[in-house]
């Protein structure tokens, strides 16, 4: 397997968030809601079920304070996730607030695309610099079978509109599944041949609620990787703030392929991201502990020093790697609550 070079950045990018294994954290994944309106068969096949007690998601002011603390400690990139973040009525205000935080250079959005065609112009105006949208199939019927929603054509129009208004690249996510996604690989490759899309195939991950689905549908991304390498695709360098994807390009394609393979050896070695849930808990790993509560330090601006101290101290408890390879997904029953 080819190794991926890491693209080094300047000294002004040095983060104060460094763990025991000398990994540097410049990337925050911020969930703003647990609610999702899709019923994806690999995540929430029965749809979102609200808890019996009313949950209060992070407010604008709380979001502002947590992002400011991370930025002060060297974070440069924030990804707004959910659930489906655009379902929040104040989503545009959230995006604007994050984008206006001193030190934040990229504000990315992960979305199911439900409102993309309608709102993409507003997202851009609010400060969203990068977009990841889920498209698990390019077949209308299959897309509805996977997601429970007949929205494929609208999402594809939203992607086209993003290019029209100046987005230079859109990342498209598809969960790699034996029955659904894998047979469409050629169709996805044809789609990105003349479009600046990074088509990202994400290995299905085992979670508490989806064990049987995982056993039936899991497919290693290595099989896709080997095929692409044989067809002339080449691995690209990674920047410090990039996500976990191994990215491949081909001289005959305008688009790229990204492979996210959490079961691969050393997957965690280049981890650069921390997660804050919509309820204000810091999660050191997607497949980890119950989270470290930050909310008691988000009510006043005067608590910033305490908040930053808690973040730095908590990071020292981050494990070297997850334990997915032995079937341990931690407390994660599904990925909707923390945005994957």
Swiss-Prot record:
Residues 20-246 form the Radical SAM core domain. Pathway: Cofactor biosynthesis; molybdopterin biosynthesis. [4Fe-4S] cluster 2 binds at residues 268, 271, 285. Binds 2 [4Fe-4S] clusters. Binds 1 [4Fe-4S] cluster coordinated with 3 cysteines and an exchangeable S-adenosyl-L-methionine and 1 [4Fe-4S] cluster coordinated with 3 cysteines and the GTP-derived substrate. [4Fe-4S] cluster 1 binds at residues 36, 40, 43. S-adenosyl-L-methionine binds at residues 42, 83, 134, 205. GO terms for biological process: Mo-molybdopterin cofactor biosynthetic process. InterPro entries: Aldolase_TIM, Elp3/MiaA/NifB-like_rSAM, MoaA, MoaA_NifB_PqqE_Fe-S-bd_CS, MoaA_twitch, MoCo_biosynth_MoaA/MoaC, rSAM. Transmembrane segments: none annotated. It holds the Pfam family Radical_SAM. Its cofactor is [4Fe-4S] cluster. SUPFAM superfamilies: Radical SAM enzymes (SSF102114). Gene3D superfamilies: Aldolase class I. It catalyses: GTP + AH2 + S-adenosyl-L-methionine = (8S)-3',8-cyclo-7,8-dihydroguanosine 5'-triphosphate + 5'-deoxyadenosine + L-methionine + A + H(+). Keywords: 4Fe-4S, GTP-binding, Iron, Iron-sulfur, Lyase, Metal-binding, Molybdenum cofactor biosynthesis, Nucleotide-binding, S-adenosyl-L-methionine. Its EC number is 4.1.99.22. GO terms for molecular function: 4 iron, 4 sulfur cluster binding; cyclic pyranopterin monophosphate synthase activity; GTP 3',8'-cyclase activity; GTP binding; metal ion binding; S-adenosyl-L-methionine binding. It is an enzyme of class 4 (lyase). GTP binds at residues 29, 79, 110, 171, 273-275. Catalyzes the cyclization of GTP to (8S)-3',8-cyclo-7,8-dihydroguanosine 5'-triphosphate. Monomer and homodimer. Belongs to the radical SAM superfamily. MoaA family. This is GTP 3',8-cyclase. It comes from Actinobacillus pleuropneumoniae serotype 5b (strain L20).
């Amino acid at each position: 397997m080819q190794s991926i070079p890491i693209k080094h950045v300047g000294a002004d990018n040095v983060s104060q968030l460094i763990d025991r294994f000398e990994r540097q954290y410049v990337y925050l994944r911020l969930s703003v809601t647990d609610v999702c309106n899709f019923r994806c068969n690999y995540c929430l096949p029965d749809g979102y079920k609200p808890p019996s007690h009313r949950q209060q998601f992070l407010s604008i002011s709380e979001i502002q304070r947590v992002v400011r603390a991370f930025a002060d400690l060297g974070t440069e990139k924030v990804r707004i996730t959910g659930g489906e973040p655009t379902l929040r009525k104040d989503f545009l205000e959230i995006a604007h607030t994050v984008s206006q935080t001193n030190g934040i250079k990229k504000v990315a959005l992960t979305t199911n695309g439900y409102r993309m065609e309608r709102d993409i112009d507003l997202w851009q105006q609010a400060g969203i610099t990068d977009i990841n949208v889920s498209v698990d199939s390019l077949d209308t019927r299959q897309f509805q079978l996977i997601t429970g929603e007949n929205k494929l054509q609208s999402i594809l129009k939203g992607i086209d509109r993003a290019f029209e208004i100046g987005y230079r690249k859109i990342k498209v996510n598809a969960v790699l599944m034996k029955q659904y996604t894998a047979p469409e690989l050629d169709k996805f490759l044809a789609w990105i041949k003349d479009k600046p899309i990074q088509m990202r195939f994400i290995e299905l991950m085992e979670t508490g609620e989806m064990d049987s689905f995982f056993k039936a549908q899991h497919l290693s991304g290595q099989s896709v990787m080997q095929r692409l390498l044989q067809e002339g695709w080449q691995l690209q360098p990674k920047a410090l703030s990039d996500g976990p994807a191994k990215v491949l390009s081909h001289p005959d394609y305008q688009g790229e392929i990204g492979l996210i393979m959490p079961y691969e050896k050393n997957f965690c070695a280049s981890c650069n991201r921390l997660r804050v849930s919509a309820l204000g808990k810091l999660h050191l790993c997607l497949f980890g502990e119950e989270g470290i509560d930050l909310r008691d330090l988000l009510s006043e601006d005067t608590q910033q020093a305490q908040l930053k101290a808690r973040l730095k101290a908590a990071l020292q408890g981050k494990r070297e790697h997850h334990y997915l390879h032995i079937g341990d997904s931690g407390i994660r029953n599904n990925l909707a609550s923390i945005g994957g």
